[in-house]
């Protein structure tokens, strides 16, 4: 009986000793920006000494990096979850995406391409302009054909 009590206490002591508290270190993250096709692209890369990490930003998840296109109105927050064994810890970050994209998109701002306007307005303007140019080209072509054929007909009559 005493042997079972001692064996039970030793089992409890050994089980308690194996559950170690994991000391999570904050991951080192780097956020870079680029101007591509009048869009502010962001790349979030993180490194850690733990087993695994996941980065979440704008409904995108990446293991060590996340690539996204940022526009005004999008969230300025991202989080990094670090895993070690069965334990994990989430670190929340806020970054001034608007200010950084504003600086990155300097040339696009010069041509009024940043911040992006309502897509419907841009598409509507483009369609109306394209239609106007097409109609103008058609009218000019028809007038050219009409007057050229008339001139050639008149010149044929003048010939003896």
Curated annotation (Swiss-Prot):
Glycosylated positions are: 30, 79
Positions on the Lumenal side per record topology = 18-124
The positions making up the signal sequence are: 1-17
Which cysteines are disulphide-bonded?
Answer: 29-46, 40-101
Bilayer-crossing regions: 125-145
Fill in the PTM field for this protein: Both disulfide bonds are absolutely critical for the interaction with MHC antigens. N-glycosylated; high-mannose.
Q: Where in the cell is it found?
A: Host endoplasmic reticulum membrane
Is Flavoprotein found in the keyword set?
A: no
Regarding protein family, the annotation reads:
Belongs to the adenoviridae E19 family.
Name by which UniProt lists this protein: Early E3 18.5 kDa glycoprotein
Q: What is the lineage of its organism?
A: Viruses, Varidnaviria, Bamfordvirae, Preplasmiviricota, Tectiliviricetes
């Amino acid at each position: 009986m005493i042997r079972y009590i001692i064996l039970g206490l030793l089992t409890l002591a050994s089980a308690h000793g194996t559950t170690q508290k994991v000391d999570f270190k904050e991951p080192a993250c780097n956020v870079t920006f680029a101007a591509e096709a009048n869009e502010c692209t962001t790349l979030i890369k993180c490194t850690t000494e733990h087993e695994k990490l996941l980065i979440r930003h704008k409904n995108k998840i990446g293991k060590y990096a996340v690539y996204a296109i940022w526009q005004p109105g999008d969230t300025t927050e991202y989080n990094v979850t670090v895993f070690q064994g069965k334990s994990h810890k989430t670190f929340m970050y806020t970054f001034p995406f608007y200010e950084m994209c504003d600086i990155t998109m300097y040339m696009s701002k010069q041509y009024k391409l940043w911040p992006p306007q309502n897509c419907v307005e841009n598409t509507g303007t483009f369609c109306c302009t394209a239609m106007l140019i097409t109609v103008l080209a058609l009218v000019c072509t028809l007038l050219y054909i009409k007057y050229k054929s008339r001139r050639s007909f008149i010149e044929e009559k003048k010939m003896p």
